Amino acid sequence: MPTVLTPPLSAKPRYTLLDGLRGVGALIVIIFHFGEAFSTGWQSQMMNHGYLAVDFFFILSGFVIGYAYDGRWRNGQMTARRFMLRRFIRLHPMVVLAIILGAAAYILQGCVRWDGTPMPPESVVIALICGLLLLPAIPYTMMDVRGYAEMFPLNGPQWSLFFEYIASIFYAIFLHRFSTRWLRIFVIISGIGLAACTYANFSGGYTMGYGWSILGWDIIPCGGLVGGLFHVSFCFGIGLLLTRGFKPRTGIRGSFWICSALLLAVCIAPYITPDGDISMLNATYDLLCTFIILPAIVWIGANGVTTDRFSTAVCENLGNLSYPVYIVHYPLMYLFYSWVWTNSIT
């Protein structure tokens, strides 16, 4: 019986439509961050659930990586070292650019924390080096130059890249070896952990991961290392699970626009609360979106095709811009926030 070889990576068709959806998610995150400048609380965001786009990124990442690489491990065409080198080349150049821009923005703002406390030049150098090496800042130390207990105070969204690297390492060492049964168990356990952290952080949502804490809710109520780990484990894992036995169905026409509308609807939904206060109903909404709706959007997109030049061009351009725009936009947001708050603009 002849041996069936997995075709080389370049032979697999590229999911241009999913690239386009990644770009839509990046734009949603930018709008979410823009609206934070005028927000008075969790209930008054311009894009109340914009942070769910990051969950979408993690799910999409798991799906695309599983689609592109799972077969190559089985046939010895991929090693952990080669895989991580590919991820490093793909991700890290823009991380370097973003953290340098973040340091420049911080210097332009006068090297002060949010409360006006001046920070010495060496603290900026330390934060810059840690950011380049993707080492999270220890809260309330010289590394925490903005004083928000962020993992990466010079470029806040870099927390998601930190967890993306963790997911990639875990995939290279363990997850690609898991049978579908064990991968399903991994996803279920991660989902239980994610739900527990979501209801335990008392924010009515689970914007977890950007803050550095021990248990997930002991330093800032909506952050946490543990919450972030469950966050990426479930999302990345369910993305991988979607690829197991995946056989694209007949192309769903208009699926890019359908999926874009669904993703926008999920993220633009108002904060869910019966009395105007922080509510666990909103946390339940977040979990339902991540457990069911966002994976469904990825599945629909993976089964879809672009059938006209305009849609194809939109997807290609959004895909090319998605990661660079996502990872470098926040240094400009720091300057924008400073301008808005200094001039009391509402």
Where are these regions (language model features)?
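Transmembrane alpha-helical segments and their boundary/interface "anchor" motifs
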Residues: 51-54, 71-112, 117-134, 167-168, ...
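Membrane-interface helix-loop-helix regions
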Residues: 91-165, 193-222, 289-302
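Small-polar-interrupted transmembrane alpha-helices in polytopic inner-membrane proteins
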Residues: 21-33, 182-202, 258-267
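Active-site His/Glu-centered metal-binding helix of metallohydrolases
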Residues: 24, 35, 57, 162, ...
